[in-house]
Amino acid sequence: MINKYTTQKILLVGANGYIGCRFLERCKDKYNIYSIDNLLKKNDLLPNINQIDYREMKINEINEFDICLWLAGHSSVPQSLADPEGCYDNNYSGLVNFMNMFKGKIIYASSASVYTSIAGAICDEDTTVGMPINIYDYTKISIDNYMSIMNKDFVSLRFGTVDGGSKHIREELLLNKMVKDALNENKIYLANPK
């Protein structure tokens, strides 16, 4: 969908987050990227990122872009449970409003959490999603369904747990927490050792 010879303009939403800042670091010199973030997590704003809430963008601003790479929103179940109204607004209703204005292609960060209720099954792209068991799952399933029903030009990336280095590391993720604990305390804590 995106290649290094493109003259297309890319809007990167969530550029200051865990995945967004790594994507921007790797691709900023190869593509025509305009990066934004609303600093929901109050991280320090990294260079080349504009502090803009996508929900405040006007239709003419949005449609200056050909492609939207959507890496924004409440990014975990714990964050979403702590702020369910914010999760719904950020992950669903705000995104629906944005998509209704945007005329280009959307590459969207969904989540493997859409399969949470399918216990023990191996899932692939053709697996039917399960019933949501929390607000995070609900917003991800709902936005996937909305884009399909509205015939939007989109790709939904259903990330599993992402780990690894980033300028804005997510310390609550299992592997990242284990590495941090091993380095800082010479111990690894198991949350559910049985």
Region locations from a protein language model:
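Active-site helix of classical SDR
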Residues: I135, T139
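Rossmann-fold cofactor-recognition segment
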Residues: L46-I59
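NAD(P)H-binding glycine-rich loop region in Rossmannoid oxidoreductase-like domains
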Residues: K58-N90
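Conserved glycine-rich Rossmann-like NAD(P)H-binding loop of the short-chain dehydrogenase/reductase
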Residues: N32-K42
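SDR active-site strand-loop-helix element
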Residues: V13, I36, C68-A72, I106-A112, ...
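Conserved Rossmann-fold NAD(P)-dependent oxidoreductase catalytic core, especially the SDR/UDP-sugar
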Residues: V96-I133
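NAD(P)-dependent short-chain dehydrogenase/reductase
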Residues: I133, N145-K194
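N-terminal Rossmann NAD(P)H-binding glycine-rich loop of SDR-like oxidoreductase domains
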Residues: I10-K28
